[in-house]
Design a protein with these regions (language model features):
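N-terminal glycine-rich FAD/FM-binding segment characteristic of electron-transfer flavoproteins
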Residues: 1-647
Length: 647
């Protein structure tokens, strides 16, 4: 079998050097860059697969300015044979939809499509640090018409030419069997990427790299670049902190430091979360006519993800912004929720009681477990049939791959990981019109230091909402709605991916959203595998406190904890009354997931750790000294002022 292994990589700015231009787009001209971390794991996965297929052709591809050749040469030095760069000024400002289209067009130009006679596999990183959408791998796969697996930790090839992938899902993992060709996006928890030898690095310096422009690959300008992308960045605002300065404990011993913490906790300290700066430039709205671009599109559609026989919490959360948007749109705008699976009708009542006006049921025994190919096809058919103006997904493992594939099918842009959704207007100065109503999708970006407002001009407008950001609507017992059925046209090729195993246990993971206290460990608390972190949470539970433990991304990346416990921009957003950060440096991506906590206590050995700038109380010390002292205090009745659940 003449297999071709293709790796897609991106060169990204160092987080410390991220800069933004006046147009709200990333300014890469002066930033030092590296290969995106997740992409490195994709490169390594390709090299690992080559062990089974030693004659495989190894290709690495990228899209970007000429400076991206540096990243491609690194890939060549690691063991890849050919390198291709799509570089054209007309691609500048492309959103993920346009990027996925451009990359897939380059791959088709190179001879790769679902009808290719020889098998191929595409590897990519889960997401990039400068965008964090996780959309492009899915969009490339959809444009090529091939199956995919996202959030994959490890892969192996079986003896029948299939790929077996282990991927992370909420609360556990899943094993999928995919035929080739297929696309795989890797998490940074797989086989660590190798370092090239000096000989290979020198050899790569002189290797040739093929550079394409859009004319070379037959790509027009209609759907690329800033003008052709279906979404734009309309506004970017700074996110500023309103938490008061941290109150540090003083003392020489762990006992004195904990005594100081207890004393400080007893004092009245006002706490406020981060918020977007309120200073706004006063500008007059021009006297342009209003234009409603929706045509016949009307209504809001959401997808209800089903896990363990229940509607996922994140899908219920979606109904909160959906109701707000429906109220803002007025004109009797309805919320329809699609429910796909086997024997799922009884779940419709839960959706009615939480705000859905209509539940559209799609029944099929083959859909008992979520599969991206049939689910994306079903929802795309439903969108064509119902013509909604807005479609919302939760930004779960499934939602992050489902939404972008549907976006390609409908020609819509997709805004990822939104923390705010509302209806507004857009002043189009070029055409001298005011577009209204239009969905304003707000998402943190540039390391969570900015809040970008994204607008989509192709209907439906599609957005994913960060799990844990919105409250679940208040349940209205007995509320009724319209129960409908939808019968899609199935394609047998949509069922070519097999689920070999699904392991999903909620346990304490669901309790992260309901906990009053979360004890979270970072790299600085991994000396014992987070044992002390878990012991502190357990001690609080034994006293009747609703407590759970969690971790930062680096702990998951190092394989110490499962992804389902990760807090932060690429994990969960939580709102406990008290968040205890132990050995967590304070990367802004982690702070994004805890900024709405009532109080934050930080414990770190480094007095200059940035986590203290985002905390209410702090202790400088070794976690191995401080946490055992806290555990003893809890066992003796100290519960951080929390209410104790009645037995």
């Amino acid at each position: 079998m003449a297999l071709t292994i293709i790796s897609l990589i991106k060169q990204v700015p160092l987080p410390s050097e991220m800069r933004m231009g006046d147009d709200g787009l990333m300014d890469r001209t002066k930033a030092k860059s590296i290969i995106n971390i997740d992409c490195r794991f994709g490169l390594e996965a390709g090299l690992q697969l080559k062990k089974k297929y030693p004659d495989a052709r190894m290709i690495v591809c990228s899209m970007g300015p000429p400076s991206f050749e540096t990243a491609l040469r690194t890939a060549l030095s690691m063991g890849y044979d050919e390198a291709y760069l799509l570089s054209d000024r007309k691609l500048g400002g492309s959103d993920t939809y346009a990027t996925g289209l451009a990359i897939s067009t380059m791959l088709k130009h190179l001879g790769f499509s679902k009808d290719s006679k020889e098998p191929f596999i595409i590897f990519a990183g889960r997401q990039t640090s400068d965008g964090d959408t996780a959309h492009v791998p899915s969009q490339v796969a959809e444009n090529l018409g091939i199956p995919q697996a996202t959030f994959v930790e490890r892969i192996e090839a079986d003896d029948n030419g299939n790929i077996v992938a282990k991927r992370i899902i909420e609360g556990g993992y899943q094993q999928l069997q995919l035929p080739m060709p297929c696309a795989i996006s890797l998490t940074p928890t797989g086989v660590p990427p190798r370092k090239p030898t000096l000989v290979d690095a020198i050899k790569a310096r002189n290797a040739s790299i093929t550079v394409f422009g859009i004319d070379d690959i037959g790509l027009g300008t209609e759907k690329i670049g800033l003008s052709g992308s279906p979404t734009i960045v309309a506004k970017v605002m700074n996110i500023v902190s309103e938490r008061p300065p941290v109150v540090m404990s003083e003392g020489q011993t762990e006992k004195e430091l904990v005594d100081g913490l207890i004393a400080n906790l007893g004092k009245e300290v006002s706490v406020a979360a981060k918020k977007v700066e309120t200073e706004k430039k006063v500008s007059e709205i021009p006297d342009f006519p209003f234009a409603d671009p929706r045509g016949a599109a009307k209504g809001i559609l959401t997808w209800a993800e089903v896990t363990n026989g229940k509607v996922a919490r994140s899908s219920l959360e979606l109904l909160t912004p959906a109701r707000k948007l429906a109220d803002q749109l007025g004109n009797d705008t309805k919320i329809s929720t699609v429910l796909i699976g086997k024997d799922v009708e009884p779940l419709a009542q839960t959706l009615f009681e939480h705000g859905a006006d209509e539940v559209i049921v799609v029944r099929d025994d083959r859909l008992e477990e979520y599969l991206v190919l049939p689910f994306s096809d079903i929802i795309a058919q439903l969108i064509k049939d119902r013509n909604p103006e807005i479609v919302l997904f939760a930004a779960t493992t499934a939602g992050r791959e489902l939404a972008p594939r549907i976006g390609v099918k409908t020609g819509s842009g997709v805004t990822a990981d939104c923390t705010g959704l509302e209806i507004g207007e857009y002043v189009n100065k070029k055409e001298k019109i005011i577009i209204k109503p239009i969905l304003h999708s707000r998402r943190p970006t540039y390391g969570e230091s900015k809040l970008a407002t994204i607008l989509g001009f192709v209907y439906p407008q599609i957005s994913t909402a960060r799990a844990g950001t919105f409250e679940i609507p208040v349940k209205e017992e007995g509320r009724k709605g319209i129960l409908s059925e939808f019968t899609p046209k199935y394609r047998e090729e949509d069922f070519r991916v097999n689920i070999l195993k699904t392991v999903r246990g909620e346990g304490g993971l669901q309790n992260l959203f309901d906990a009053d206290v979360i004890v979270s460990g970072g790299r600085g608390a991994t000396g014992d595998g987070l044992a002390l972190i878990q012991q502190l949470a357990d001690a609080l539970k034994e006293k009747g406190v609703k407590a759970e433990w969690a971790c930062s991304r680096v702990v998951v990346d190092e394989g110490i904890s499962e992804y389902a416990r990760q807090i932060g921009q690429t994990g969960k957003t939580v709102r406990p009354k008290l968040y205890i950060a132990v050995g967590i440096s304070g990367a802004i991506q982690h702070i994004a997931g805890i900024k709405e906590s009532g109080k934050i206590i930080a414990i770190d050995h480094n007095p200059k750790a940035s986590v203290f700038h985002h905390s209410d109380f702090g202790i400088v010390g070794e976690y191995s000294d401080i946490v055992p002292e806290l555990i003893d205090r809890v066992k003796n009745g100290f519960v951080f002022g929390m209410e104790i659940a009645k037995s």
